[in-house]
Every structure is written in C-alpha cells, then in structure tokens.
Amino acid sequence: MTADHHNTIQSQGLYVWQADNLLAATAALSGHWQPAQESQDSTELEVTSNRITTDTRTIQAGDIFLALSGDNFDGHDYINVAASKGAIAAIVSRPISTSIAQLVVDDTRLALGQLAAYRRQQHPNLTVIAITGSSGKTTCKEMLGSIFGRLAPTLITRGNLNNDLGVPMMLLELSDHHRYAVLELGANHIGEIAYTTEIVRPDVACILNIGTAHLGEFGSREGI
C-alpha cells in the first residue's frame, strides 16, 4: 500500500529484477538457474521483471512466481499455472518440469526474505519506521502512514502482512519513488522480530507496549 499525499495505491515496484541480481540476492541460499525446457543454455538466460509474487491468483504477464510451501500447500504444484498466466520465471526449492526458467534455492521462504533485504539495500535514501507491540500496532501504523504520506510517497503495511512472510512481501512492493516506509512487525514465535528487523533495517523503531494477551511460545511477559 502506498500513501502518496492524499492518494492510496498499491505499488507495482519499479526496480527491475534480472537474472544476475536475482542470483546476487539469493547467493547465500545457493541460488542457481535452471533454464526453461526448450533452452539448456543458462549463459544466455534473459529474465527481466518488475514484480515477484507468491500468489498465482494475482499473476500478471511478466511476473516472477515464488513457490512457497507450508503444511497444507506446496507452491511448486502451481508453477505451470503461473506459467500459463504469463509468469516468465519461478523461484523454487526443487526444479520441476515446466516451460519457464527456474531459480533454484535451498529454501524459498528464506529466499523471500533475502530478496526483500536486497530490495531494501537498493534504497539507501528510504526512511523506515518499524512498529511493534502487543496492541495498537495497526492504529499507530495508519496514523504515521497518513502523516508521512502527506510529506512524500510512503509504503505502508497492507492488512495483516506483518509476519516473517508478510513483511518481506511488503518490502518487495518498494519502488524508486518511495521516501518513507511505515511497517508493522508482529511476532508469533521466538526470533521472528529479530528476523524481520534484519530484513527491514529500520531507521526508527516504535515499541508500543508489552502485554500478555498473545503469549504463545513466549510463555511470559519476560519471554516476550
């Protein structure tokens, strides 16, 4: 979500992803290209895209599809669906038989974070405000987003994209016109805030409160 003065729009991301910077972003995860079926020459691989997405329902022509996997789903099962909708490449943890090039990495969930961190590093003039706490995050985010959005184009966390998947997804929406980012960081498990903070690298951190409503594996207020 982008607050652009009085207008709120979804950013499409203006940074260009290409074969070489995708490799650079995922180097720590052994990223390497598997060319499309009709071409076995990875040296001539051409990939140029403005957007990475994890949802085949929102695929647009020219997108790159990142195949996430969970307990009850496997994005690798939908790579050919993504290709049929115009995706030009896929980011996978195991190559499959498909008509598009695949960037093979050790872990696509971690690759999402690496790609988001790379995008953040591309934007050294961006001021990032990160907000966390047991309650009040969304209200504070909306207030600050409205304020900063009147000063300059501002990326604001959309919906509940505040976990270790949602935060990097939001950063992938950064484009070169953004000057501020107001990001909400949630914590469902130990280490999640440390992980998302490393990706976001905030200039300003807002810790609103520490309550006991959602202890989960933290066990106590002290654990949080």
Place the predicted regions along the sequence by residue:
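Short, basic phosphate-binding NTP loop
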Residues: 2-132, 139-150, 172
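Phosphate-binding loop of NTP-binding sites
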Residues: 111-223
